[in-house]
Amino acid sequence: MKFVDEAAILVVAGDGGNGCVSFRREKYIPNGGPDGGDGGDGGDVYLLADENLNTLIDYRFEKSFRAERGQNGQSRDCTGKRGKDITIKVPVGTRVQDQGTGEILGDMTRHEQRLMVAKGGWHGLGNTRFKSSVNRAPRQKTLGTAGEARDILLELLLLADVGMLGLPNAGKSTFIRAVSAAKPKVADYPFTTLVPSLGVVRMDHEQSFVVADIPGLIEGASDGAGLGIRFLKHLERCRVLLHLVDIAPIDESDPVENAKVIINELNQYSENLSQKPRWLVFNKIDVIGEEEAAERAKAIAEGMGWEGKYYMISAVNREGVNALCWDVMKFINTQPKAMAIEESAPEKVEFMWDDYHREQIAEVEAEADDDWDDDWDEEDDEGVEIIYQK
């Protein structure tokens, strides 16, 4: 299935049903009083995280989702039926953003997590609500409010503990094949990896971590060169980044400059991502002798200004790979889980009409001193008043 990690959709909640103006009519009771019911609330729109999904491709074709409108109120104090909610399933790891305001509405990081993204309109009030000692036959009602409408952007961010960084053909996919059951494509040409992939590294029966491989970066990626930097967002949730450097490039390029290219592109993408723990890993030491590899690694680290520890591995021969994985596992175990997942926005989204009915009743009470009987006509049953919310 094609990997799609972004989709823009329109979500529209249902409108609230209108209130009803009605009067009770029974035999021998000509003036039975008001019995108009309230309308029903509009349906809400929810997102539901589903661990069985791994792409947003469905929403490249279906872009509009509308919840059901609430039914209007009826006579005999019958309240209109509430509109049905609509639930949209998205992969775990989806970030939800309001395109109009840029606000992050939520981060779907848990299976079956629900997030309301559009709230249904409030129901209108029937004329029974407006009955009082000075207005025994009210002809006022209110209309239901419109449902919330949002243009939202769905962004799928992979949930991984470890992220792989490096130029094309640095050996990232080979590394994942060596340490996990994942089988990304490997070849001797650039950009063999076109979409992100995940692999689970099992150290023993109880300990494991997830590693993410993204397409390689090249100089100018921040300006759109190569595959650009759009896939770097999949590393935002990682707790540690492994920066793979080809210690003996086949094109005889300078490994120091190659490493600096990655660091520069990382800085241009996000300050937060550039400050994540990053480990330096020299790959393909099997191409040259052990002593020469050690000398080159030391020289490259000094040229980069690298002061921390670095690793030398051969992903093809699995040389040094196991020790690296155990160090990664120990590091992950010492980090709080919260580091891997950004603090998500609150799931409750505030909407502007939360106090709608309270304000409506307050307005009516404020006008209680007005003489609503001045234009009363015993013969006029059609003079309906509708209160519009400003």
From Swiss-Prot:
Keywords assigned by UniProt, alphabetized: Cytoplasm, GTP-binding, Hydrolase, Magnesium, Metal-binding, Nucleotide-binding
Its biological purpose: An essential GTPase which binds GTP, GDP and possibly (p)ppGpp with moderate affinity, with high nucleotide exchange rates and a fairly low GTP hydrolysis rate. Plays a role in control of the cell cycle, stress response, ribosome biogenesis and in those bacteria that undergo differentiation, in morphogenesis control.
InterPro entries: G_OBG (IPR031167), GTP-bd (IPR006073), GTP-bd_Obg/CgtA (IPR014100), GTP1-OBG_CS (IPR006074), GTP1_OBG_dom (IPR006169), GTP1_OBG_dom_sf (IPR036726), OBG_GTPase (IPR045086), P-loop_NTPase (IPR027417)
GO biological process, one term: ribosome biogenesis
The family this protein is said to belong to: Belongs to the TRAFAC class OBG-HflX-like GTPase superfamily. OBG GTPase family.
Name under which the protein is recorded: GTPase Obg
Cofactor: Mg(2+)
Comp. bias intervals (Acidic residues): 366-384
Chain spans, region Disordered: 366-390
Entry's EC annotation: 3.6.5.-
EC top class named in words: hydrolase
SUPFAM superfamilies: Obg GTP-binding protein N-terminal domain, P-loop containing nucleoside triphosphate hydrolases
UniProt-annotated binding residues for GTP: 166-173, 191-195, 213-216, 283-286, 314-316
Signal sequence region: none
Organism: Serratia proteamaculans (strain 568)
Superkingdom as given in the UniProt entry: Bacteria
Subunit structure: Monomer.
Binding site for Mg(2+): 173, 193
GO cellular component terms, semicolon-separated: cytoplasm
Positions of the Obg domain: 1-159
Keyword field contains Mitochondrion: no
Record domain OBG-type G: where: 160-333
